Structure formats: structure tokens, C-alpha cells
A protein has these predicted regions:
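Alpha-helical transmembrane segments of multi-pass membrane proteins
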Residues: 1-318, 323-606
Length: 606
């Protein structure tokens, strides 16, 4: 019998890759918090496989070792392919979680979906337990090969998803597992098996990209919204320019051809689409996992000429920082389609440095990419440098006290959330430590411009960000942090200006006047609160600031209906603003990517 160490290594290698690729599939199909079900259901599969062996141990150990392993690998090969194909086509929707206790069909759908996830891990759990039971004296060696296989599998994920994407990678794993099963029947030693596997890997690697098409059509949860462009708009109204998997998910580029649809998207998306061109030119759209999207305007000379688009300075609410700053040095975190770079350049920015974490966006916007010319070469324009790195990392590498404006315009970490690296609601861009890092980077008169979603009833993430900034300013040495902050409500967005030094009276007045003429309501500080800090008001931003001054901010946060606690890098749950006492399993809230529906995911994990 060939060495069992090879098999342990191989199935651990396959196991970690299955978990990672299934993570990618589920996040592409549904919301990011669905992803975190994979690990517990994989563990459930291990447990079922292990218990199956223990229950039928006597009968199984009467069989030939070679036969048990070969048949198990054959079954694993088939199940990998079947589970993958069914998981891609199977409808998995957030409404199943919402109706978990109210609808039997929802329970049935979830059970079916997670059974598909679990099945391959039943075989893996069976095989691992089989080898450890068969050779208990070699458990240390078996464990070593198990860890090495898992470690190399995790590293191989990045190579495979960039090379073969998702379905073809899983097809390769299924093929290699089938090959190993056959080799167990025909080979006499593990050296022959290794050579055979390597030969099959090379052959499959050469032929798969040509012979096996990558599946593009998935059953997507409609709750993802209009960013699922193929599901929301007729095919004749858009062109698919690009579609590619990478470690953060799948990025698609759509050119929106229908002017009415372009206008409808523009009107509904407010802040993220605002550009100081009149009229706005045609745009395409980057969608990563049909969530983390960004527009790319056709700012090539012919694109601007087609609609006679002209720069119109100070026509948009998001240009408010430039009422104070003149020819600033700018950092853009989340450069996306280059809109913030473009607006900074129109205001004479002395230099612009940007970070774009998504490798597909960075590649397509850079020289040689499909949208480099279309975007007006914005990523390679004069005095512009864009890096394919995380925003926090970029800030750490720049010279302190050397920039005047840091822009985070609706930057969300859906891509990071969806990898499974984060837990439900993390973001390291909005922690207290992050704000302190941003402040260190600024010149004395510099400012941070956060643009976040604005909730009409009880503010959530904007109020949470308000609390974070007040605390960060205090720890950075500000004597009166509330004098460093101005917040405006712009349509469904908040414009947050955080200045390193206090706003002067003239600067405040300039911002207030700009707000009045650009559909923006002054949220903080209101005149009533500024004139008499003891005045009670229904404005929660004023109330929190007053509690902060009085040293009672923790009391305010405790009684506030949503979680607005200050987060740090050690506790970075920015998107967690629902408290457990709000959770009613029979009336689950879904608010875009958040809501008490997250508690339903956690219940399934438990």
C-alpha cells in the first residue's frame, strides 16, 4: 500500500481549497455574512464522516486498505464536481434567513444549500479519521502532513484563482482526486503516484483553460440590488466588457448604453456618482461580487466631446473640501473609477496619491487596461500615483504632516468582508486607530473627508463615525475635538469633514454657505447647540457631542438604540450597529449589507 502520508497531504490540500472556493461562490451569489456558514458546515461534515467510520469501524477495517482509500477518493472526486455545479445554480437568498422561523420552505432551501457545501467534507472527515485510526503510532507524522497540505493549499488558492478562476480550479481538484483514486489501483508505490499526479496536473493545467469554459452565469440573490446588472436590466441596454475572478471575488465591467438607465442609476446613487462635469458623460460600471461597485466615466477626449461635457467647478456637494483648501496634496483611499482623482485635479491638486485594493480594477484602469483610455488615463495622469494596496497600508508608508486632504468616499470593505478574512462587520478603514493615522498624515490645516450612508430616523454609521472621530481627535491632542468636525446631510449621504486644527469662523461660514446652495443640510454643529451647549435638541450628533464634553458619552451610547461604540483595530466592527436586544427572529431586519439578519447567520453557526 502506498504511503498514507501522501493521501493525508492531498486531502488537506483539497480541503482548504474547497473551503476557500466555496467561500468565493457563496459570496458572489449572496450577501457577505452568508459566507461565514461555510466553516461550521464543513466541520459538521468532518464530524459526520468521522462518526460514520466509528459506527461502522469493524466492517470498514475488514476491507482492503487500498480499496477503502480508492473508493473514498473516487466518491470525493464526484461530489466535488456535483456540489460545485449545484451550488452555482442553486438559489440562495437572504430571505431564507429572514423567514427561517416563519416558513418551512426557507428552512428546506437552507438545508439543501448547506448540504451541498457539507458533502465533500464528509468524505474528507472519513478519510482523515480512517488514517489516524489505522496508524495511531504515526499520528505525529500524519498531523505534520495534514498541516503542510492545508498550508500549501491556502497558498495555492491565490495562484489557482488567478490562473484558472473558480469552476476550472474546482474541476482541476476533482480531476486530480479522480487521478489519485485510479493511481491507487494501478501503482505499487507512492513515488509512482506522485509522478502520475504531477503529470496529470501539468496536462490538466495546459488543457483546462482551452477545453473547460469558466461558468459565468450564477443564480444570484436579487436582494443584492441593481448592481446585479444582468438581473436588473435588459441585455440590449448594456455590454459586458470584462469578467474575471481574483482573490477578492469576481469583478465585472458593464458599459451602460441606455441613457435612461444611466440617468436613473445616477439619480438613485447620489454621492457616489457625483462628478463636476455638465452634463455627465457616458459611464461604465465596475461591480465586484455585484456589491462593491464604482462608476467609470468616459473622460477620454471623444467621450467628453460626444456629450459636450464641460468641467463645472463647485457644482456638486462632494466638492465642499475645496471651498477651504487651495491646490491641496490629496490622498484618495478607494480610487475606484477615478472620479475623486478627476475632481481633485480640476481643483488644481498639487499631487494625488491613491490606493485601490481591488486588483482587477487597478489592472483595468492602469496603462494597458481596457479602461485606461476610456477613463481619460486618470490613473496615470500628471502628478497622480495609484497603488494596488490597502488604504491603511498606504497611509502608513507616506510622510507624516505632508498631505492636505484625505478622501474616503463611500469606501466599503465588502471585498475584504467577503473573503472570509473578516468576521461579519469589520472595517479597518474607520477605526479610531485609522483616524489617528490619517490625522498624523495631514498638514496643520488639512482635513479628512468621509462620505457615508445617512439613515433618516436614527443615525447609525455616521453617528458611530462621529463618535470615533471625537475620540481620535482627543487622543491626537485636540483640546476641543468638536470644533474640528462639520457634518452635512447630502441626499442619502453624509459629508463628514474632520480638520486637524479647529475650523475657523470663516471656514465654518464658507462650508455652511456651500451646504445651503448644494442640497445639503447642516447636521453638526447646529447653531442652537453652538450658541448654547446646554440646549436640549433632537439632533443626536449635538446630543452625543454634549455627552462627550460632559464625559458621559458611554452612558449615551449605552441607551442609544443602535451600537455607536468607538471601535479600534482590536475591535473593528464598524458595520455592527444593531444591538442584540433589537433582535426578533420573527421580524428580521435587512438593511443593505447589515441588519439583524446577521444574528440569524450567527445562530446557524452556533
Amino acid at each position: 500500500m502506498p504511503s498514507c502520508h501522501l493521501v493525508i497531504f492531498f486531502i488537506s490540500f483539497v480541503c482548504i481549497l474547497l473551503e476557500l472556493f466555496f467561500t468565493r461562490i457563496l459570496n458572489f451569489k449572496a450577501w457577505n455574512h452568508i459566507v461565514y456558514i461555510i466553516i461550521p458546515f464543513a466541520i459538521l461534515g468532518y464530524g459526520i464522516g468521522a462518526n460514520f467510520l466509528l459506527i461502522f469501524k469493524e466492517k470498514i477495517f475488514r476491507l482492503k486498505e487500498r480499496m477503502v482509500v480508492a473508493v473514498s477518493l473516487l466518491a470525493l472526486s464526484a461530489i466535488i464536481l456535483i456540489s460545485t455545479l449545484l451550488l452555482i445554480r442553486f438559489p440562495l437568498r437572504v430571505e431564507y434567513l429572514v423567514n427561517l422561523f416563519a416558513n418551512l420552505s426557507a428552512i428546506s432551501r437552507l438545508l439543501q444549500a448547506y448540504t451541498l457545501v457539507m458533502l465533500p467534507f464528509v468524505i474528507i472527515g472519513f478519510l482523515v479519521t480512517y488514517f489516524f485510526s489505522l496508524k495511531p503510532s504515526e499520528s505525529n507524522k500524519l498531523y505534520f502532513f495534514d498541516l503542510v497540505g492545508a498550508g500549501l493549499g491556502a497558498a495555492a488558492f491565490f495562484f489557482l484563482i488567478n490562473w484558472l478562476e473558480v469552476f476550472r480550479s474546482l474541476f482541476l481538484l476533482s480531476s486530480l482526486t479522480l487521478a489519485l483514486s485510479i493511481l491507487f489501483f494501478i501503482c505499487k508505490n507512492h513515488r509512482q503516484i506522485i509522478l502520475g499526479l504531477l503529470a496529470i496536473f501539468v496536462v490538466c493545467g495546459a488543457l483546462l483553460p482551452r477545453l473547460v469554459p469558466e461558468i459565468k452565469e450564477y443564480a444570484i440573490d436579487p436582494a443584492k440590488g441593481w448592481e446585479w446588472i444582468p438581473g436588473y436590466y435588459p441585455k440590449e441596454d448594456y455590454d459586458t466588457l470584462f469578467s474575471e475572478w481574483h482573490p477578492l471575488g469576481r469583478t465585472d465591467i458593464y458599459r451602460i448604453k441606455n441613457p435612461q438607465i444611466r440617468q436613473a442609476i445616477f439619480d438613485s446613487s447620489a454621492g457616489t456618482f457625483e462628478i463636476n462635469l455638465d452634463p455627465p458623460p457616458e459611464f461604465s460600471y465596475f461591480a465586484t461580487n455585484f456589491l462593491a461597485g464604482t462608476p467609470i466615466y468616459n473622460m477620454a477626449p471623444d467621450g467628453l466631446q460626444k456629450y459636450n461635457s464641460q468641467v463645472k467647478l463647485f457644482s456638486q456637494g462632494m466638492e465642499v473640501p475645496y471651498t477651504i483648501l487651495r491646490e491641496p496634496k490629496v490622498v484618495v483611499i478607494g480610487t475606484g473609477g477615478g472620479r475623486d482623482i478627476f475632481m481633485a485635479k480640476t481643483h488644481g491638486a498639487a499631487g494625488i496619491v491613491g490606493a485601490e485594493i481591488n486588483p482587477a480594477i487597478f489592472e483595468q484602469m492602469s496603462k494597458g487596461g481596457r479602461l485606461h483610455e476610456y477613463s481619460g488615463q486618470i490613473y496615470t495622469a500628471d502628478n497622480v500615483k495609484v497603488f494596488n494596496i490597502d488604504g491603511r497600508h498606504l497611509v502608513k508608508t507616506l510622510q507624516p504632516n505632508s498631505y492636505d486632504l484625505i478622501i474616503l468616499n463611500g469606501v466599503d470593505t465588502f471585498s475584504g468582508l467577503s473573503t472570509g478574512a473578516y468576521a461579519y462587520a469589520e472595517s479597518y478603514l474607520y477605526t479610531k486607530n485609522a483616524v489617528i493615522d490619517y490625522l498624523k498624515l495631514l498638514s496643520d490645516d488639512g482635513m479628512i473627508n468621509f462620505n457615508r450612508w445617512l439613515f433618516a430616523d436614527y443615525p447609525r454609521e455616521t453617528l458611530k463615525l462621529h463618535a470615533i472621530c471625537l475620540q481620535a481627535l482627543r487622543e491626537a491632542g485636540a483640546q476641543e475635538p468638536w470644533k474640528h468636525i462639520i457634518i452635512g446631510g447630502h441626499k442619502r449621504w453624509s459629508i463628514n469633514l474632520i480638520k486637524k486644527t479647529p475650523f475657523t469662523a470663516e471656514e465654518k461660514q464658507a462650508v455652511k454657505e456651500y451646504f445651503k446652495t448644494h442640497e445639503t443640510e447642516l447636521i453638526f454643529p447646529t447653531e442652537n447647540w453652538e450658541n448654547n451647549a446646554a440646549v436640549e435638541t433632537t439632533n443626536y450628533y449635538d446630543q452625543y457631542a454634549q455627552a462627550f464634553i460632559d464625559g458621559k458619552e458611554n452612558v449615551f451610547a449605552h441607551f442609544y438604540p443602535f451600537d455607536i461604540s468607538v471601535i479600534t483595530d482590536d475591535d473593528p466592527f464598524f458595520y455592527k450597529y444593531y444591538k442584540l436586544n433589537f433582535f426578533n427572529p420573527f421580524a428580521v431586519a435587512v438593511v443593505h449589507h447589515t441588519g439583524t439578519v446577521i444574528f440569524m447567520s450567527q445562530m446557524l453557526v452556533l
